[in-house]
Amino acid sequence: MTDRRKPSAHPARGTSGAPTPKRRLHLVILVRSFGFPHGMANTNRVRLLGRALAQRDVEVTVLCSRVSEKPGSVRNTRVRGVADGISFRYTAGTTVRPDSFIWRRIREARGYVGTLLALAHLKAASKLDCVYLWSGAMSWQVGPWLLVRYLNTLRVPVIVELNERPWAPPAWPRVIAKRLSFLDGVSGVVAISSWLAEWAAGEARRLGRQVSILNLPIVVDVAESAPSDGPHADQTLVYAASPGYDAALAFILTAMQEVWRRHPECKLIVTGGDRAPSRVPADSTRDDPGPSDERVIRVGYVDRDSLLHLFAQASALLIPLFDDDRSRARFPSKIGEYLAAARPVVTTRVGEIERFLQDGETAYVANPGAAAEYAHKIIEVLDDPAAATAVGRAGLTVAMSTFHYSLYGAKLRKFVESLSESRQ
């Protein structure tokens, strides 16, 4: 979960001395499938990018077109407000999902119409320079597609967030496939990885469209973390699981068989996720330890302060990626939070990892899919805590110099401004 904190500048560089552009921009960040200001990775990225823009004299408004909360586990209670200098509003009139199927459809319709009216009102008031749309790229959806058409009629440039592998359209006639493309009607793309930036460039060429592309990696507020000092006596590994990524946990459990042979007291803490994996892959040498082995501790979802504390106290932080397009496209935000905790990160050589991290220097990096090699990287950490601490500290330096959110405020503002001026 994210929480609202006092905005921080980069701990090493700051932003107070930077010149502020004169023209005030107005940006709407439109989200559909997650809440604000509290939530998970997407919420945190919206919060940090919005904060970076607010520090650059951009008036940012977040419109949530759908409810985000389930009854009994409500994190976002306010329908409108201000968080970190970012205005937000739930256009459905509530944050909580109704129990009734009919009322859910009514709330969804109200949120959609409310979004259209809010955008029209902002446009009429000359307070809508650009819309930054977060609609998800893994499947085609009629709602976002129609929304882009609507914004085109208002002559408002649309930026789309691209942080996952896009869907592949069926083998339909070219004219239909072009109209259903993720980029149809879009002016700009913010891509979280170079793989996605290259995909967007290729898709724009296929469509014959002029689409501006900004490769903006994961962002983190390094001031949120409180790194601990020195090596840790307790051997504790932490894996922050994401929904839909059971294979990663199964891979880790396979690797832990080898780790436990050398370090039988080592514990694995798993946060978040969907559920325990149904099985450990076939190359495991023992039964699935997930539900029964006391060394595997599943804590579920925890509040953000507790999560960051777990990161800071861990012997190592785990995040394996796989040799497939899904992993090559994504760049998990938790990597930035791991690095900011100044604890050693154990990952695999896929996608953006090779761009930003060096094995044995700023992280421990194994080849993808090799559970035994991944286990040996974990063992390296546990065998030499002092060296692992040095690697963790070097990783923090990477987070500060490369991923701190305020580093990207000027670049993102310039991107928004250029698209806005192109429509004037």
Model-identified regions with their sequence ranges:
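Acidic donor-binding loop of glycosyltransferase active sites
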Residues: 311-328, 343
